[in-house]
Amino acid sequence: MSDPEQFIRGIILNLEDTSENFLLLSIFCPNGLHRCLIRKLRKLTSLSSPDLFDEVEITFQSSMNQGLPFVKEYQVIKKRITIAKDRACFDGACFLARFYLHNGEHLLESAKFFQILHKAFHSFSEHHHPPTILLKSLFLFSQAEGLPVKESWLFGLSKESANIAHYVLFKPLKDSVILSEKVPPLLESLSKWLRAETELRC
């Protein structure tokens, strides 16, 4: 009896060189974080090789002996090469990818978290302000986890900072450009709160 096949569609958060022949892919999709092995391409092919932050559809063969599954077929649905053209956006995308790798293993209702990630990577691709993207993403992630981020962190800010944060968090990215320079201290404040008050690794 052959091993069962599974199909996923998600975003590549990490590629790790594990051997001469295989790469380890870490992919976050609507049903959570998945890891699988893909054979390295050794010859020219019309098939686009999956890369960091790409959105992919993958069919993989699950291993009956509890080992990592192997990719049987894949298709790159959306490449995000524009992220790498802006260093700040690339660094921001890497930060969010690490955050999901550290905290995305046992999430309930993973589809909500995938939507947050998907929207963030679209924004990075469009070269919006990285600290603002991260602030909104971490805030939404915390809310989706059921953490009191609004009641504890947001309401604990000074009146001026709270007003700025509220505007940035609840307005479209394009409308908060004028406040971009005010965002990094808020992002640092939220990151500190997450490290001190929650079990999330940030």
What is the predicted function of each stretch?
Residues M1-L23, F28-C202:
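Non-catalytic alpha-helical scaffolds and adjoining flexible linkers that form interface surfaces
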